[in-house]
Amino acid sequence: MLSKKIILILFVFCLSCTSETSSTKLIGKFNIEKDLYLAQFDCKTDTDDIHSIAGIATMLSDSRFLNVKYHAVAGTYGIQDGLYVPANELFEIAFGTHWSDAHSNFEQALSEVTKLVIKTLKEGGNIWIAEAGQSDFSASIIKNIKNTFPSINTKFQIHIVQHSNWNENNTATDNLTYVKENADYIKIPDGNVVGNGSPGFYTEDKVNWRNYITDSKLINVWEKAFEIANEYNGKDGRHNNPAIANGGMDFSDVSETCWIFGFNYLKNAVQFFEEFSSLNN
């Protein structure tokens, strides 16, 4: 039999482990106290990014995300052809001052984001990138980090989540290879499909989102998203998204953000709105 002294030591050890775990404030894999979340949108040429911006703004408005540090980036496209979908007004409504415009000024956006990333990494935090597009911008971030602070282990501290084969195929080959070698690159199932292990946020059916979203800011965000997506969907050779053309929704890129924050159990668009309904806050 174990002596009382050994039992006491084991009890104190277990208690200390429990206290350490419970003191770490996590949402899914994200440490609220240290980490930085980056939402990067190519916005070229599919208008699904526009719906995805509204979807991510909806998640960030939830009370559970109150202290999440985040930054969004517009125009993180790769080598694909086609026209850009301008959505600056939507970015401003959705993210306030927490976004950069890589389409208008790539170097300025890269500088702004690099500063945020370096600050987080130096303080021991991780970077979680939801890649709603290609990975060329992410490659530039990592190269900046390695040039400035080569001692930082980007493979351990920078996580890139990608759901789309198309996005990978339209990333410059050398940049895709680079991020896979120098970051924790995570490929999840396609967010356009229901029942494959990722939430399926593509639907050609209309979703009664107003039954769930009553917050005035979010109503404004979604209305602006629909306005922009409807204006540019298929316009001047841009991709014609069938879901958006039929009055449905496509915020499939949000599947990556759900994976990061532990909501990848959601099945479809309706379950998304049930989970993040304004009525729950």
Per-region residue spans from a language model:
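Sec-dependent N-terminal signal peptides
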Residues: 5-14
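N-terminal acidic, glycine/proline-rich low-complexity segments
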Residues: 22-281
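N-terminal secretory signal peptides that target proteins for export/translocation
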Residues: 1-2
